[in-house]
Amino acid sequence: VNENFEEKINSCVWSAGREKYAELIRQVKAAFRNIYQYAFAIEQKCAMIYRFTEQALDEIDFACLFNSEKKLLAIGINTRENKQSVNCYDMLCSEARLTSLTAIALGKIPAEHWFKLTRPFTRLYDLPLCLSWSGTMFEYLMPDIFIKPSENSMLYTSASIAVKAQEEFQSKSGIWGISESAFHAFDYSREYKYRAFGVPAIAVSTFKAEKIFSPYSCLLALEYAPQECMQNIVRLVEHGMTGSYGMYEAIDFKHCESNGGPGIVYSHMAHHAGMSLCALTNCLYSQALRKAFSSRSFVAAVSVLLEEK
């Protein structure tokens, strides 16, 4: 906390005006004092969080999730039977590759795991594209928040093509951007239902195309198509997609056709808002999160994996 801030405030006010503006000066001083105290408290909390995450990083154990036979990470643990799920994350173009990279970098799982991840290829726009399971923006771009593949690499090219495919898969009003999200249908407890939506042209799985667009999906693509993303955000705002906590979860052009227009999913999901804020931070503050993550020595050891052609 700057102990001299009151003197600095006094020096900014000419002596003749101090009496006249005494109350205003008092309020300004009090406000600055509160700001300094609040900033100091935040700094202390950040230091505590840093120590906690450092310890967690050292102690995290991937052995319970690593299938030593398949050399893949299981999607979870059956806690009743204390067994790994038989299903594994087995595709390179997946949000799970961030976990794969981190676990390899920390020496928690062998590097050969990376090469066990499948790379199903197709051609789109006369370019090679590595497919994802559901054709979502999330699968291609979420890992980019922390570590972005080298330009002209296979992952970078695939992400660029995926963004273009997502742009073309749009509503009549030009809205685009699809990932897993809530949609305009309700479960027995009157909560919005939730599942993955994607673009069929970039997906391995087969499904009926449904146009449910989520703002976070668009924001993840900011660095690949900044102008198109901002135009898309403007369209979302024009469709009433802003609330007290930012943009609403999604706009559903599929399940509300009988009502004569799209349905807004009036909810906010913390992890989607978090991804949006992270993507905006990287875009506006010179890739701050990416630089912070990449500055760790263990990350540098695996960056070569992202140069795959």
Q: At which residue positions do the language-model features occur?
A:
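Ser/Thr/Asn(+Pro)-rich, low-complexity disordered segments
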Residues: 1-309
